[in-house]
């Protein structure tokens, strides 16, 4: 069996469906997980889907992916704008990385328009709500090693 695609979500994404639904939509993180699993299955892939509000835990999972994953999808949420540590972990992992955002950061507040994660990402998918994750999984499957 081939290695899975890791799909990692950062802080506050556990609140999807209730937190600012006018920006992030009404689907829950569990809904997003099911969409990703279905897309991966249709592509002959599996995923490992995780969320954490803790930077260190996300870094641990990124480092774990180095040996256990074929590609990585990450929605860093707020950490995208602040975490050089996550950037460094992504650069060290040696895997294709697809950055994913539910909203379009370029169309939001100035501080959201740049992410450190983009410096390590092979590509970025944003602005399509929960479908951003599906598209990111599809891209990661195409890039997988």
Swiss-Prot record:
Keywords assigned by UniProt, alphabetized: Amino-acid biosynthesis, Aromatic amino acid biosynthesis, Lyase
Signal peptide: none
InterPro entries with a match to the protein in the record: DHquinase_II, DHquinase_II_CS, DHquinase_II_sf
Catalytic activity reported: 3-dehydroquinate = 3-dehydroshikimate + H2O
Annotated pathway: Metabolic intermediate biosynthesis; chorismate biosynthesis; chorismate from D-erythrose 4-phosphate and phosphoenolpyruvate: step 3/7
Presence of keyword Zinc: no
Subunit-structure text: Homododecamer.
Disulfide bonds: none
Family of this protein: Belongs to the type-II 3-dehydroquinase family.
A single GO BP: chorismate biosynthetic process
Active-site residues, as the UniProt record annotates them: 24, 101
Function per UniProt: Catalyzes a trans-dehydration via an enolate intermediate.
Domain of life according to the entry: Bacteria
Molecular function per GO: 3-dehydroquinate dehydratase activity
Enzyme Commission code(s) on record: 4.2.1.10
Site feature (Transition state stabilizer) residues: 19
Organism: Phenylobacterium zucineum (strain HLK1)
Pfam families, sorted: DHquinase_II
Gene3D superfamilies hit by this protein: Dehydroquinase, class II
CDD domains: DHQase_II
Protein encoded by which gene: aroQ
Protein name: 3-dehydroquinate dehydratase
Residues reported in the UniProt entry to bind substrate: 75, 81, 88, 102-103, 112
């Amino acid at each position: 069996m081939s290695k899975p695609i890791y799909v990692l979500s950062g802080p506050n994404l556990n609140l999807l469906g209730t937190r600012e639904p006018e920006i992030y939509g009404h689907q829950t993180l569990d809904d997003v997980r099911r969409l990703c699993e279905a897309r991966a299955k249709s592509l002959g892939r599996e995923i490992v889907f995780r969320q954490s509000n803790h930077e260190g835990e996300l870094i641990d999972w990124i480092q774990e992916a180095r040996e256990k994953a074929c590609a990585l999808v990450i929605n860093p949420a707020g950490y995208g704008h602040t975490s050089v540590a996550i950037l460094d972990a992504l650069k060290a992992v040696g895997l294709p990385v697809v950055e994913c955002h539910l909203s379009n950061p370029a169309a939001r507040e100035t501080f959201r328009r740049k992410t450190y994660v983009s410096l390590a990402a092979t590509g970025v998918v944003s602005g399509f709500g929960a479908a951003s994750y599906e598209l990111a999984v599809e891209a990661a499957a195409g890039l997988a090693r």
